[in-house]
Swiss-Prot record:
Gene this chain is encoded by: proB
Keywords from the named record: Amino-acid biosynthesis, ATP-binding, Cytoplasm, Kinase, Nucleotide-binding, Proline biosynthesis, Transferase
Protein name: Glutamate 5-kinase
SMART domains registered for this protein in UniProt: PUA
Binding site for substrate: S56, D143, N155
Record EC number: 2.7.2.11
Pathway in which this enzyme or protein is active: Amino-acid biosynthesis; L-proline biosynthesis; L-glutamate 5-semialdehyde from L-glutamate: step 1/2
GO CC terms: cytosol
Residues annotated as binding ATP: K16, T175, D176
Domain PUA: 283-361
Family the UniProt entry places it in: Belongs to the glutamate 5-kinase family.
Gene Ontology terms describing biological process: L-proline biosynthetic process
Catalytic activity: L-glutamate + ATP = L-glutamyl 5-phosphate + ADP
Membrane-spanning parts: none
Length: 376
């Protein structure tokens, strides 16, 4: 089966629509364009596919309603604009899809919702039930309550995490660019569109020369990283131009040469591992010797204190930490069994020495393999 045929077979879709495609050049939402997008989403639903929308545009709509001509930089001003614009954004999607007798649901998420196991499972169950009922969820970051430390950062990342959450087979990221080019098209007019790439190819990041737009936070780099993240649940990602006519239907028909297809190049992670991988913020880092790093990379074994040479940061038991090899490269991340001060006391020691060092022993491992995801 040609790899684009995976799109024809995909039953569960996440579609991310960028700000440039649904705003009137910064003057609020472009309702005619949104209505046209709703028509395409409705056609996909009519074909029996489940669809989740991740939609930008709340800040741009809020700026219009507040009379602001330039995007603010202060977080509290962005939050105010998002709060004002969010209702208009969801209302516009609701109106467009209601013409096709489709129900929508507003879903606002924060990183904390996905890093807490119970809330993560609740969000997953709610979204899956909406999809089962034929509802089109419209997902966005809950900008009015997040801080810089706990924000997703951009809707490309959020879309990938939602794809993981609902175990989508296809993620479509619609932008104002044709896809990923082999060179920066601003500097090389003869740059060629890449038709198909491996989602985890480390060479892709160097091709991302385009910055984010004025109204959006994401550039091509966030889309490449989002595709890699989505691939953890086996999701195929397409980055394509929303300026193309009937682009969603054409992608669903597996049309070749439309956008860039990011192909998953590893086995999908188990559900719990996907949750672990969804943590964007970490509380500290463990520096490993070569033997421990190799054991994690090649065998996915638990991390024992003896393989740790240094502890960075201040973290509590059960928080997420990064594991780095001697070159400083992340090899894994996981939920640690000991607080930072305890970890500093037992690092480099055999597990049998934990009790004599601390006066007690909680676990023989610093991080158990079930609470760890290898990231290389």
């Amino acid at each position: 089966m040609r790899r684009r045929e995976a799109l024809r077979q995909a039953q569960r879709w996440v579609i991310k629509v960028g700000s440039a495609l649904i705003t009137d050049d910064g003057r609020g939402l472009a309702h005619e364009q949104m209505s046209a997008w709703a028509d395409q989403v409705a056609a996909l639903r009519k074909a029996g596919r489940q669809v989740t929308l991740v939609s930008s545009g709340a800040v741009a709509e809020g700026m219009q309603r507040l009379g602001w001509r330039s995007r603010p930089r202060a977080l509290y001003q962005l939050q105010a604009a998002a709060g004002v614009g969010q209702s208009g954004l969801v209302h516009a999607w609701s109106d467009g899809l209601a013409r096709h007798r489709l129900q929508t649901a507003q879903v606002l998420l924060t990183h904390d919702d996905l890093s807490d196991r119970r809330r993560y499972l609740n969000a997953r169950s709610a979204l899956r039930e909406m999809l089962r009922l034929g509802v089109v969820p419209v997902v966005n970051e809950n900008d009015t309550v997040v801080t810089d430390e706990i924000r997703f950062g951009d809707n490309d990342t959020l879309a990938a995490l939602v794809a993981n959450l609902v175990e989508a087979e296809a993620l479509v990221v619609l932008t104002d660019q044709p896809g990923l080019m082999d060179r920066d098209p601003r500097e090389h007019p003869d740059a060629v569109l890449l038709d198909e790439v491996r989602a985890g190819d480390p060479e892709l990041e160097r091709l991302c020369g385009s910055p984010a737009g004025v109204l959006g936070r994401g550039g091509m780099l966030t889309k490449v990283r989002g595709a890699e993240r989505a691939a953890r649940s086996g999701t195929y990602t397409v980055v394509a131009s929303g300026r193309e006519g009937r682009v969603i239907q054409r992608l669903a028909d597996a049309e070749p040469g439309l956008g860039t297809l990011f192909v998953p190049d590893q086995e999908p992670l188990a559900a719990r591992k996907q949750w672990l991988a969804s943590h964007l913020q970490t509380r500290g880092a463990l520096s490993l010797d070569e033997g421990a790093a190799r054991a994690l990379r090649e065998s996915g074994k638990s991390l024992l204190p003896v393989g740790v040479v240094a502890v960075e940061g201040g973290f509590s038991r059960g928080e997420m930490v990064v594991c780095r090899d001697p070159a400083g490269i992340e090899v894994a991340r996981g939920l640690v069994n000991y607080a930072a001060e305890e970890a500093r006391l037992i690092c480099g020691r055999a597990s049998r020495d934990i009790e004599t060092t601390l006066g007690y022993v909680d676990e023989p491992e610093l991080i158990h393999r079930d609470n760890m995801v290898v990231t290389v």
